[in-house]
Structures are given as C-alpha cells and as structure tokens.
C-alpha cells in the first residue's frame, strides 16, 4: 500500500526551499513534461543530462538568443517562435562546476533523482561532497541508480505518479535564480565555440543542434562524444531526441543501434568517434539491405580521445595501450559498404554538407578530422566559465 498519507505527501517536499533535480538517461520522453511542470512549481533547477531529453523542453520566460534572462518572451523577438521555453532546465553545469567554490554555495536541502545518474562526474562529486541533504531516488523498479550511495528515500514509482502525488508549490525562487545566473554565464561562454576556426567537436555539436530538423533523432556515441554533448548541446534549442548506449559495453553496436532508430524514417544522425565506428563497422551492411537513411558525423582523432583527460595520460605506452590509433581510411570503408562520403577540412563546410546530405538517401559519412591534444586545449578554452561569486551571493 501507499506508505505516505495525503498529509505526509504534501509535507515531504513543502519543508524544503532549495530542491535540486537530477534528470539522467532512461527517462521516457512522455514523462518529460511532468518533470518540467513539477520543477516549475517547486522552483527547482533541473540538471538535465543530454540523454534525459529534458533539454528538449522549454517554457516562456527563459534565456534569449543573447543569453539574457527575460521575464516575458511573448514580446521578445529574439526568442524562437512556437517553441516551449523553460528557465528551470540547466545544461551547462559541467562547465561552471569546475569551480569547486560553487559547490557549498549551491548546496540544496533536497535532491531528487529521476532516471539514471547524470554522466557528469563533477555533478556526482559535488553531490557526494554534501552532507545532511535529503536524497530522494525515484524509479519504477527499485533498482538503485545512485552510485554515490547518498539515497535517503528510495521510492518505487513512475515519474508521472511521483510528480502528481508529491506536487507542491514553492514561493521562493532564490535558489533557482542562483542556478539561472550560472546558466547564463555558461551558455555565453560555451556558445563561443561556434566561432572556432579549426575543426572541433564542440563547434560541430553547436552547428548540428542549430541546423538539423526538429523531428530528428541523434544517437550519441560513448566516451568523449556523450561528454561533449553534455557541454555543448544546450537546453531549448532543438526538439531532436537523443539516444545513447550507456554501460560497460556501451561501445558495442553503435552503428547498428543508429540504423535501428532509422527504421522509423525520421531524420537520423549518429555522432561518433573513430573507435566506436570501427568497433561496429560491419553494421553498415544492414543499411543497404534494408534501405535505411543515416547521416554519420565522424570525429576522427585516430584513437580514444577521452584518455587525454584521464590519469593515464603521459604514462608509458600511453599511445599503444590507451589511444589505440588505427590509422584507417574511412573513405575506403564508405566505398566497401556503398555509403556516401565527405571529408571536410574546415568547420565552415559542415552546414552546407548537412543540407546537401539531407536530400540524399542511404548512409552518408561526414568525416571531420580532429586532433586529440588540440581538442583538449580547445575544450579547456571554451569551457572556462568565469563566475562572479559576489553577484551570485
């Protein structure tokens, strides 16, 4: 039976003025609006993992094209028309949370987790550093999705059920506004990646989000790709649905999964590194036999770029054991499987190529050569968010 009486349900969250919501992968797209309405009433910021698809939704009164907080977007010509816009969704958290001085300032009274834990290591470390915080974990199976071991209340419920039964209105927006100011600063900084003159994963993602059709679906590969999306795929700028294969063997079947998505005949994209593509190259054969359409955005840095950011960097045999360069010519792979192929040498070429490929059938590989070490430097440059602590306090 329901262990919470109606009175207890109303009191559970009413006692907290600072509630933080974590929205991770494995949230059904049909439940996103419930999370949104729940958070708005609670004045609770949502740290939305890109694979949660909570970033797809916005409601009037958020951040305009100049990254300014606006109070009424009905009269704001800079806002995207006919889109729901929300100011509770936070998408640039992994950048500004690099400043650990923010962690105690952003400490809530209560954390609510929907779906799996977010991919951001900084968010996990920040939450793990907080003591005496209620941590409510919601999932329909009672499987623990919280690797930090911070859960104080584990509730078996669907998201729709929980957000309906435990809805409460919070009159104080002070905590939410603190996160919103950081989001403005984060977007202002990260958006400058679109001006990067060299091929860079961050610029690709910004271009992709702005130029693919709203009804698109994107499979996001593992390793650095999903983490780059965490940085550069902003809230409220696309209705595209993001998918991912997360887990220990998440690299398995990347191409095949993307082609499976393409069977619904929606515009479908795969954004991947070279190792993930190489791992499931034979999956391309399925496209021809089933007449499937797929655009593959291949960032080819000839190896595993994520290890440039990990402690293994600089160790003996690093390139051989971790970077695992393959030195493959993917134009040959495209020819082998009957795919279209374009290799770009300048980021300015991407948008015209995307437009051209959208009118073609079959699989098309757009190869973007990048450099692992230089990408790491650019990553540091574009994700360095300056925070005014005095204004925040």
Task: List each model region and its residues.
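Short acidic-hydrophobic, aromatic-tinged amphipathic segments that line or gate anion-handling sites
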Residues: 89-93, 152-164, 341-346
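Terminal amphipathic helices with adjacent charged low-complexity linkers/tails
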Residues: 135-137, 141-177
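Active-site donor-nucleotide binding/catalytic segment of nucleotide-sugar enzymes
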Residues: 13-29, 191-198
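Glycine-rich, anion-gripping cofactor-binding loops and their flanking helix/strand elements
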Residues: 23-136, 238-263, 267, 279-281, ...
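Short glycine-rich anion-binding loops that position phosphate/pyrophosphate groups of nucleotides
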Residues: 25-27, 51-52, 116-119, 223-225, ...
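Thiamine diphosphate
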Residues: 228, 233-393
